[in-house]
C-alpha cells in the first residue's frame, strides 16, 4: 500500500479558492486556531508561538506581544473556517488528524501545521510526497471541518493496524503483523492475516495461518501417512504409526514367539509362519510345553494353598461376626422422684441381659451419682464375663424435645470380669429442675452395645 507522510486540511478542501482572510499571513495555512494582537492582526497559533520566542512583536503592526496568553482568539474566523467543506482524509490513504500543530513541514514538532493529518512513517524508508485518491476503496463523504472529528471516529473507511502476534521459533521476541487495513475490510484481513489463529482441519489444534502448512506436514497427529517400513497402500494416522509398527507392520523384524524355549532368531513379521514350520521348532515347542506344564503345576499348588488359607480366614470371620453382635434396647424408669429418694449416692438400679449366649452385661443407673461422680445421674456398663473385649456403647436420655436428647458414646477396652465404664449426665437433675428429661416422672434411656473385638485367653504353665 502506498502511503503519504501527511495531509493538510488545505489539501482536503473541496474548493481550494477560498478567502485570503481564512489563511495565516505567515505560513499561508488555514487559520484553524486563529489568534490576534490587540490591533486585530491575525495569524495561526504556531506562528505566534515562534514570534513570541523571537521578536515578541506583531508581524504586521509591530505592537508588543509579551506572551501567547496576551493574545485573543478570533472566534468569528474560526467559526467561518470550520464551515468549509472538505473530503474525508480516509478518501486518500491512512491519515490521523492533528489539530494541535500548524506547519506544512509535517515533522510532528512544535512547528507542524494544525491542519495536517499525520501518517506514521516507516523507519529508513522514503515515503512519496503526493496525494493519491483512493477511488475504489476510499471514503466518499463530503463534510465540514467542524464535523471532521466525530466523522473520523465512526468512518467505515478508517485505518486500523493489525495487532496479531507471532512467536517466531528463530528468536525469542514476538513478531507483530502491523498491516494497515480499512475498518470495512476487517473481516477480509482476519481471514487472510498470516499471523491469524486458525484451527487445523484434521486435529483441531490452533495454529498461526503462516504455520498451518508446516504443522500439517510435519506434526499433525491426524495426518494420514504411509508406513516407512512396509509402505503399504493403506494410510495410517500419524498418531497410530507407533502401534502399527509394534503390532501390525509386516516388514518389522520381531523375535520368534518361541524365544523363551530356545529359538534366538529374529524374522520379519510376515515370515513368522514359515519360520515356525521348520523342523527344529518341534523341539522348541516341546520345551515350551514342558515349561508351561511346570508353571501350571506350580499354580495348582499355590491355588490349593490359597483355598486352605481362605477356609481358615472364613472360619475366623464367622467367629468374629458372631462376637460382633449389636444389641439395642430401651430402659424406661418410672416414679423417678421416688428413685431419687430411695437411691442415695453410690446406690444404683440395675438391668441385666445377655448380648449373646456367653456375653452377659449389666447396666447400672446411679440417680444421685456413683462413688466417683457425685450428685449427677451416672450410667455404667458392666461386663459380666471374663474375656477381655473392645466394646463400643452408647446411652441416650430422651428429652421432651427430641432435638435436645442427651447422647453419649464411648469405645474402650473392658478387662476382666465385672470391669465397667461410666458416663455422667449433668443435665438430668431432680424433678423440680429436670430440663425436660423427666417426662411424667419417667426417665427413658436408649442404649446400644457392640463388641468390636474379643482377645484370646492365654494360659502359660512353666
Curated annotation (Swiss-Prot):
Zinc-finger (RING-type) residue ranges come to 24-62
User: What's the main place this protein lives?
Assistant: cytoplasm
Which controlled-vocabulary keywords does the entry list? Cytoplasm, Metal-binding, Repeat, Zinc, Zinc-finger
* Cellular component, GO annotation: cytoplasm
A Gene Ontology molecular function term for this protein is:
zinc ion binding
InterPro entries linked: MATH/TRAF_dom, TRAF-like, Znf_RING/FYVE/PHD, Znf_TRAF
TRAF-type zinc fingers: which residues?
150-217, 214-273
Give the span(s) annotated as Disordered.
Answer: 104-127
Which PROSITE patterns has this protein been placed in? Answer: MATH, ZF_TRAF
Q: Write out the similarity annotation.
A: Belongs to the TNF receptor-associated factor family. A subfamily.
Q: Quote the record's domain comment.
A: The MATH/TRAF domain binds to receptor cytoplasmic domains.
Q: Give the protein's biological function.
A: Probable adapter protein and signal transducer that links members of the tumor necrosis factor receptor family to different signaling pathways by association with the receptor cytoplasmic domain and kinases.
Question: What PANTHER family does the database record attribute to this sequence?
Answer: RING-TYPE DOMAIN-CONTAINING PROTEIN-RELATED, TNF RECEPTOR ASSOCIATED FACTOR
Provide the protein name.
Answer: TNF receptor-associated factor family protein DDB_G0267754
**Organism of this sequence:** Dictyostelium discoideum
